[in-house]
Amino acid sequence: MTKTLPKDFIFGGATAAYQAEGATHTDGKGPVAWDKYLEDNYWYTAEPASDFYNRYPVDLKLSEEFGVNGIRISIAWSRIFPTGKGEVNPKGVEYYHNLFAECHKRHVEPFVTLHHFDTPEALHSDGDFLNRENIEHFVNYAEFCFKEFSEVNYWTTFNEIGPIGDGQYLVGKFPPGIQYDLAKVFQSHHNMMVSHARAVKLFKDSGYSGEIGVVHALPTKYPFDANNPDDVRAAELEDIIHNKFILDATYLGKYSDKTMEGVNHILEVNGGELDLREEDFAALDAAKDLNDFLGINYYMSDWMQAFDGETEIIHNGKGEKGSSKYQIKGVGRRKAPVDVPKTDWDWIIFPQGLYDQIMRVKADYPNYKKIYITENGLGYKDEFVDNTVYDDGRIDYVKKHLEVISDAISDGVNVKGYFMWSLMDVFSWSNGYEKRYGLFYVDFETQERYPKKSAYWYKKVAETQVIE
């Protein structure tokens, strides 16, 4: 049976400042930790990325032509405050006013994120969100933006608090590149959630117009053998690290007893302790019912198997299928069922996981209000032929995920939109320029844009709301 989506559904495309803009030192932009980290550790940098800093009128015109009626944009904190605090950079402010005006001119609603992996270097090198002073700096930056950019109707505090802690302190593929420090992972999650809560409360107390929420990456975790209690436990612990700890903070305003039991077990095995304060929980509690929406970024699921041994994680950044490894002491290891398809980067393709995650939010956090799927898409080594890309695999991937969103809506969940990652090809943080996601192919040499086959397909779905 052909499935449909509501008439008022947002069919969006997603971007992020650092992955798309380029112009990393232009017009007074301050440095971010990624600038030097990429130079020192990777085979690429964020120059020129997709040159969105200059080419945004082209991308927004294409968006309008191809039925894309929403765009995720992030503000680069260091374009507004080059050192994260203190002096404002007027050229950065002017750029975003111009960008938002162009969005509205093209009838593409901007959903604006304040922080997408790019803390200004001055604050990042001072402990990033492990340093509680940076909570204050973030809230001040948020307040400036709420006041200044009154043309924005949809605000998101953070993009993917989970993968920030994970990338910076567990896998170690994000600056500062620390590995296997679970206490830092949870402390980063917690302090960022307090920052989120305080910004949301300020937004509501000040009576700003528009809506505010947060974007969480929520990869669904399953036991490898659902009949084995040890595998079930491994999946539960892995879910706490990546999903439940953060969701509890967002919607319960505290961590449930079951969540804290899991956290304490993980820290007993791996070492370290957390600094969780009374005033933190007061802030979390005050904001728990104020989120207007939850953004869910979903790409994949994982299967977990019980495991007794030391932590070892190998990140597959070059698309060499089968080269990744993930096992955490006291938690478990990832082991995929043989019959589930994977990308070249070992990301498991499992649309059912998105449905299950959406239904979990509805069941466990009934105060969620509404959901946007704020990222979903297929990273691929696209072949550019005849000025396009025949990306049937991407079409199939997006189609199947839109279908389960339709199912979730039928089953009573309030899902209001979908943003494909990514609008145009951008650079991928730890995978470079080879891993493409866009509806529009970018020739990174010339910065020309070419609609892929998926763009024509997406346009038809957006126009008809029929998934076929």
UniProtKB/Swiss-Prot annotation:
Which GO terms fall under molecular function for this chain's record?
6-phospho-beta-galactosidase activity; beta-glucosidase activity
What name does this protein carry? 6-phospho-beta-galactosidase
The UniProt record lists the EC number as: 3.2.1.85
Look up the record and report any one GO term of the cellular component aspect.
Answer: cytosol
The answer to whether UniProt assigns keyword Hydrolase to this entry is yes
Q: Which UniProt keywords apply?
A: Glycosidase, Hydrolase
Q: Taxonomy-wise, where does this protein's organism fall, top ranks first?
A: Bacteria, Bacillati, Bacillota, Bacilli, Lactobacillales
Q: Which Gene3D superfamilies match?
A: Glycosidases
Q: Please give the family membership noted in the entry.
A: Belongs to the glycosyl hydrolase 1 family.
Task: Look at the named UniProt entry and state the broad enzyme category this protein falls under.
Answer: hydrolase
Q: What InterPro entries does this protein map onto?
A: 6P-beta-galactosidase (IPR005928), Glyco_hydro_1 (IPR001360), Glyco_hydro_1_AS (IPR018120), Glyco_hydro_1_N_CS (IPR033132), Glycoside_hydrolase_SF (IPR017853)
Record flagged with keyword Aminoacyl-tRNA synthetase? no
GO biological process terms, alphabetically, are: lactose catabolic process via tagatose-6-phosphate
Q: Which gene encodes it?
A: lacG
**Could you tell me what reaction this enzyme catalyses?**
a 6-phospho-beta-D-galactoside + H2O = D-galactose 6-phosphate + an alcohol
